[in-house]
Amino acid sequence: MAHIVILGAGTGGTPAGYEMRHLLDKSHTVTLINASDTFQFVPSNPWVALGWRETRETTFKLRPYLEKKGIQFIAQRADTIDAPHSRIHLANGDVVDYDYLVIATGPRLAFDL
């Protein structure tokens, strides 16, 4: 029935995808779109910087985990959101139509303010 698209597969988008897939019946499609094919647990970055952890211990490939739960995954940067037509244009030229859109791309920090 409905196609729910979530932009961003970080600490907001990934759990949102899991929850939606769990709560909605299989007639609905849930798709996560993320510029990278990996999840990085950002709170662990200081541990990596100090040498307490390796990068491989704080990142993992998203696709196998999402697809195991019935969530579609597109590893591609979104260029534009065409809200009037419910479409997302991706960096590779593909277009993804949606019925509902969740934007969970994280903050843009303003260090210069």
Segments predicted by a language model, with ranges:
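Beta1-alpha1 glycine-rich phosphate/pyrophosphate-binding loop at the start
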Residues: 2-72
